[in-house]
Amino acid sequence: MEKKKGARGNIILECTGCVRNSHNRVSKGVSRYITQKNRHNTPNRLELKKFCPHCYKHIIHGEIKK
């Protein structure tokens, strides 16, 4: 039997600090995390505070489109 695709889907969280300060940073790259969320309970964009190895601090990571 095939399993139904539920409301839970994979999302990508991207560092908002790396995207904004891309022109004057020491390290190249953007921090991204992959996680899951329930689209029925959280229909709007998800934002979590995670550690960014490029900014060297905890900063808000926002959901991006695939």
UniProtKB/Swiss-Prot annotation:
Alphabetical list of SUPFAM superfamilies matching this protein: Zn-binding ribosomal proteins
InterPro entries for this protein: Ribosomal_bL33, Ribosomal_bL33_CS, Ribosomal_bL33_sf, Ribosomal_zn-bd
GO terms for MF: structural constituent of ribosome
A GO cellular component entry from the record: ribonucleoprotein complex
Localization annotation: Plastid
PROSITE patterns associated with the record: RIBOSOMAL_L33
Major location (coarse): plastid
UniProt keywords, alphabetically: Plastid, Ribonucleoprotein, Ribosomal protein
GO biological process: translation
Domain of life from the UniProt record: Eukaryota
Classification via HAMAP family: Ribosomal_bL33 (MF_00294)
Family per similarity comment: Belongs to the bacterial ribosomal protein bL33 family.
Protein name (Swiss-Prot/TrEMBL): Large ribosomal subunit protein bL33c
Organism encoding this protein: Cuscuta obtusiflora (Peruvian dodder)
